[in-house]
């Protein structure tokens, strides 16, 4: 689950991490009032959406007067911001975060992710702050310095000092960085994060380190332990279909193709999408119905797929391991009858009672096309989507 920048910074402040003073604005009146409360004569106005690249898209701007903040609010509040990380529709701007500015001496990068191979947390630091860290890793990997944290022992101050030396910090800056490093690691572990980024982490002209931006992604599997974080969820930033899928424990990701895919198992789902692409098709979604492909879940899965007007055919690829293929076939038939599908549905069943499942589908009298192999299923789906 993603958090907005202002939400992440509020949590940063709880962990004694240095952040600029800011005010959350939900309306034009809030923003006008905020500039009279904040210090200075220049403020940073930031659209709050769950996507990077806001600055390049015009969603972050320095404002110096009431007229400028009015113009910014009129431009963005209630509108959709399109960045390189969003789809063509962008994401809705409901909130603008207005904060005090500072004079910047240097921009750094500091982030943390989970390394699943070592089962540890990896911190990455770089002098290339303010840039996309993926680009830095690809073009100048020598600029990225790493520290590995064992969740059992937590971060140690000496690790922070080592990173500070590598970043060229000196004097009191090293002490500040070590504190920041240890507290970020503590936050990462205690809040069950999947990703944490401060980009940029700036060194001000006064020699103070400041978290100018903040990104937090919480492991959704751990939200049951953090009701206070669950309460921060912003449904307006999520795909409505993906939110509906989550209610039924369906893993759904919308794509831009025209062949709907319904599969049980994430690996098989990705393989199915690959083979559809291999044969010239374009998947409209990733959809994993999981091991318990019941009638109700299959029905909801069909509804999700058909809610996309671009879908011209549906490919169902089920491996009957945990559940029998004959039961899956009955579930598919019941779901098709309930939903009322008027586009081709290609079904490939394999595993326990697969032959019986295919026989049930063939005798259903419905517009279901049975396939014996995944290759055949993909080819049939591509032809059906093309109207052949």
Swiss-Prot record:
Keyword Transmembrane helix: no
Amino acids binding substrate: 264, 321-323
GO cellular component: cytosol; succinate-CoA ligase complex
Listed EC numbers: 6.2.1.5
Domain of life (superkingdom): Bacteria
Gene Ontology terms describing biological process: succinyl-CoA metabolic process; tricarboxylic acid cycle
Protease in keyword set: no
Any one GO MF annotation of this record: ATP binding
Key words, A-Z: ATP-binding, Ligase, Magnesium, Metal-binding, Nucleotide-binding, Tricarboxylic acid cycle
Pfam family, one: Ligase_CoA
Enzyme class: ligase
Cofactor note: Binds 1 Mg(2+) ion per subunit.
PROSITE patterns, per database record: SUCCINYL_COA_LIG_3
Pathway named in the protein's UniProt entry: Carbohydrate metabolism; tricarboxylic acid cycle; succinate from succinyl-CoA (ligase route): step 1/1
UniProt name for this protein: Succinate--CoA ligase [ADP-forming] subunit beta
Gene: sucC
């Amino acid at each position: 689950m993603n958090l907005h920048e202002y939400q992440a910074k509020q949590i940063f402040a709880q962990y004694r991490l240095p952040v600029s003073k800011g005010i959350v604005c939900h309306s034009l009146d809030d923003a006008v009032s905020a500039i009279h409360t904040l210090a200075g004569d220049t403020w940073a106005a930031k659209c709050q959406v769950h996507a990077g690249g806001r600055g390049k898209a015009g969603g972050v701007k320095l404002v110096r007067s009431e007229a400028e903040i009015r113009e910014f609010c009129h431009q963005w509040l209630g509108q959709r911001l399109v960045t390189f990380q969003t789809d063509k529709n962008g994401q809705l701007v409901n909130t603008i975060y207005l904060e005090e500015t500072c004079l910047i001496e240097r921009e750094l990068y500091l982030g943390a992710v989970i390394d699943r191979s070592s089962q540890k947390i990896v911190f990455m630091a770089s002098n290339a702050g303010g840039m996309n860290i993926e680009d830095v890793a690809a073009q100048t990997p020598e600029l990225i310095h790493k520290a590995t944290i064992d969740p059992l022992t937590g971060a140690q101050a000496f690790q922070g000092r080592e990173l500070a030396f590598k970043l060229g910090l000196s004097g009191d800056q090293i002490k500040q960085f070590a504190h920041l490093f240890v507290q970020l690691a503590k936050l990462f572990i205690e809040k069950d994060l999947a990703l944490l980024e401060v980009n940029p982490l700036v060194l001000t002209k006064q020699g103070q380190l400041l978290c100018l931006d903040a990104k937090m992604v919480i492991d959704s599997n751990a939200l049951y332990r953090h009701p206070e974080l669950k309460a921060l969820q912003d449904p307006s930033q999520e795909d409505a279909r993906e939110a509906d899928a989550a209610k039924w424990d369906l893993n759904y990701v919308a794509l831009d193709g025209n062949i709907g895919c319904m599969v049980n198992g994430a690996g098989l789902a990705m393989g199915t999408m690959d083979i559809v692409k291999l044969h010239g098709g374009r998947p409209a979604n990733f959809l994993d119905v999981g091991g318990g492909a019941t009638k109700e879940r299959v029905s909801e899965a069909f509804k999700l797929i058909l809610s996309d007007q671009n879908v011209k055919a549906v490919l169902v690829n089920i491996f009957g391991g945990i559940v029998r293929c004959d039961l899956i076939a009955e579930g598919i038939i019941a779901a098709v009858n309930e939903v009322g599908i008027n586009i081709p549905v290609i079904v490939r069943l394999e595993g326990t009672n697969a032959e019986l499942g295919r026989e049930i589908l063939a005798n259903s009298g419905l517009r279901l096309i049975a396939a014996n192999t995944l290759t055949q299923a993909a080819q049939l789906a591509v032809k059906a989507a093309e109207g052949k």
